[in-house]
Structures are given as structure tokens and as C-alpha cells.
From Swiss-Prot:
Its EC number is 6.3.5.7. GO terms for cellular component: glutamyl-tRNA(Gln) amidotransferase complex. Heterotrimer of A, B and C subunits. This is Glutamyl-tRNA(Gln) amidotransferase subunit A. InterPro entries: Amidase, Amidase_CS, Amidase_dom, AS_sf, GatA, LisH. Belongs to the amidase family. GatA subfamily.
Amino acid sequence: MPFSADSVTSLRQLADALAARSVSAEELARTYLARIEQAGALNAFTHVDAERTLAQAREADARRARGEATLLTGVPVAHKDVFVTRGWRATAGSKMLANYESPFDATVVERMAAAGMVTLGKTNMDEFAMGSSNENSFFGAVRNPWDTDRVPGGSSGGSAAAVAAGLAPAATGTDTGGSIRQPSSFSGITGIKPTYGRVSRYGMIAFASSLDQGGPMAHTAEDCALLLNAMAGFDAKDSTSIPPEQGGVDEDFARYLGQPRAGASESQPLAGLRIGLPREYFGKGLSPDVEETVRAALRQYEQLGATLVEVSLPKTELSIPVYYVIAPAEASSNLSRFDGVRYGHRAAEYRDLLDMYKKSRAEGFGAEVKRRIMVGTYVLSHGYYDAYYLQAQKIRRIIADDFQRAFAQCDVIMGPVAPTVAWKLGEKTSDPVQMYLADIFTLSTSLAGLPGMSVPCGFGDGNMPVGLQLIGNYFDEARLLQTAHAFQQATDWHLRRPAKA
């Protein structure tokens, strides 16, 4: 039977087809480039360079012919436009960097290229990763492939939409407060935010340095494991990268996939697994359709042998104010470098250097970015640092401790990714607080630096996807992926595709 990309459901299938020479990397790249062109209305990509992509694909084919291929050689991937890429624009979704081209590759891009993966293009995103709906991009809003009148989630909305619509088999994303998990949930794909420090931030345009973390977005847990194998590892160029002596060792994140837990059977591969359900994740604010879908997924886990245990994360409601003090404070510092002098947007007319700074930043940044810079500058200012920033950091420590108390009672924590399914475009843009509340279940994981993922588990109102959130303890990605994979072996939610894909 001739190869057809339409029948592909995982990266493993693509890798096997490439290894068997059923399809070449160049043929595969041409297929996905054609899809990207046809689906331009989704606005998932900010930059596509077909010739550059095809050159990479031809090199992947040559590498395979020389017998130097890795498992992922020739497999296409899209990169969130927050990762700098030599020869491609790196805009962070902002007018400030609309025409910026980096002289070097981000470590994540470099490592995936070293594995032989082929870059399809750069995906749209909320400006400087500040947003939950991908409506804050200078390049326009991204549309959800399941319902093009709805948001795909943010800030990695372009990556989520691209994977969901079949425009790319996989994509990179970043997660500062939920920006891999929430769009994965809204778009019906699988995504994982690793432990903070697992994946290098070198070459990742910074929003909040103590929170930002890169990770993969794809269709299956196995896909994410294979991608994480390529992405993760210590990087001396990133001061926040975890060195081997502190746990940042290279490992095979796919090593437990398909294996029952110790002492478990094939029919109940998760026997002995204790799943913690935070009571704060199932209360006021959670829409009934999402709760029903998530609880159905939890019943499936019980059938796989797991036991459900109630736990408490008492500071969950404080995660929003804590995050929106710490993240804007760090953004205020990080974004001070964008002034139009060495790179980035520069105002056309100005009186002097100070006027040029002011006008360039006023013209280059969008409304949400300006709002967060102002909030961050305020909380760091004299007289307010102790009252806001220092207090927020203290509560952040308490939030991390709460997770450790919960993990004393369970092996993995589960719950909804978001309180609702994806909302309509424009529905929350006039109310920033309502937009921020959409991240209530993802922020605390980021504040604690824990690994978390979203796994498709059904559909809610409007036949829109719902994601189940899995949270593991530090460095527990392999077990987290094993737990997600077992669910996907027993269900087919991850195989569902939007009608137009």
C-alpha cells in the first residue's frame, strides 16, 4: 500500500515510513507545506520559507542514504516563533521584532536539527508569550481548527492549531503559566511542560525567566517522549539548565511506554498507581461539561487499575495574583532590552535618543504587553517591592510545598487543564481578569516548576476538545508519559481530528 500522510496518527508512523523508504523527507515536507498554504485562514504560521524547508529535507534524505539517520531524521516540525532560528524571522508575535532574524539557533532548534528534523516554519503566538487565547499577536489571531470562530488557546496557539489541523505532525511550544497545556487542551492534542530547567532556554525569547520552559506538542504521549528525547538535556549556555549532578541527566523519556507498572498486569497496567485529585480543582468555576468529561477519564484510569485519592492544594486560588506579580516583574526587566537601538522596531521620527526609546516602545509593543510591563515595573518600584514581589515569592514557596505534601499521598495529580472549553474569539479580550482566570489550574504547576501535561480526554460544549491535566513530581516525566500513554492505549480521543483537518 502506498504511503499516505492522511493516515498518519503518530511520529512513530512517520519515522517508520521514512526508515522503510516508503516516503522521502522531501515528499513529506512538500505535503505539509501544501497543507500550510491551503489552511492560511487559520493563521497558524508567521513565517514559512519553502525553499529552506526543502533544502533541509533533501539533506535529511542524504543523511539517511549515508546511513547516518536518527529515529527523527526527516520528520517535520514547526517551531513556536519564540525560539530564534538562523535564517528565519524570530518575532515573538510582536511588531517590535517583526523583521528580526537571529544570527544563531536556539538550543532547542539546534538539537532537533542535529536529530535531522525538518523545520516547516514558525508558528504564531501571543505577543512575547503573554496571553491565553492567541489574540494578542501582531500578526493577527489564530483560529481553532475545531471551530474557526473560537480561540486555540495561548500563548502557543499557532503550534496547537498547526498540529490539530494536520499542518505539522509536531511543534515546539513554551509554557510560562500554561501555554503548552492550555492550547493543547483547547485544540485536542497532547503537550508536556517538563520540569523547569529540563529544556534549555538559550535562544528562547524571554518572558519570565524563572517560569519559562520549552516543551513538545504533538498527537500522542509517545510523540512527546520522542521529541523530549531530542530537546532535553543540560546546556551550559543556559544558567537555569539543570546540571547532571542535580538531576538533569540525559534519559530516554520513552523507556516506560507500554510497560505495566511493577507488579501490575497487562489488563490493569496501572495497578498500584495513586492519582491525587485536588479538591480545589473540582469546585466553583469549573464548568459542568468539563468536569463530566474529566471524571469520565478518571473512571477509565480506575479501570486501568489506578486508585483515586483526594488531596488538597490550598493555595490554588492565590496562584493567579502570585503569578501576575512575579511574571510581569520579570517581563518588565526582560523586555527593557527592546529599545530600537541595536535591533527591533525603531520609530521613524523622533527628537532625541530618549524620544526614540519612548516612541519605539510605544509603537512596538501591543496593549497586553504594555499592561504587564507597567504592572511589573510598579511591583518592583521603591516602596512596593516588599509588599508585592517579596510576598508573592514567599507564597510561591508555599505553593511548591503544598505540592510536595500532596505527592506524599499520591504518585501523580490529575484534574482539568482549564475551567471551560475554548471560548469564542473576542469573548474575553475586553476583560483581562476573566482571561487570567482561564489559567487557574495551570499556574500553580508552573510556579512550583513541576512537569505537567495535557492529554485529550473527550469533548465538552460545542463539541470542543477537553484536556486532562497530569502533574508529576520533579524529574518524573518518564512516569508521567507512561501514565498518559496507558490512557491513550485504552482510548481514542487523541486520534480524533477536526473535520477540516
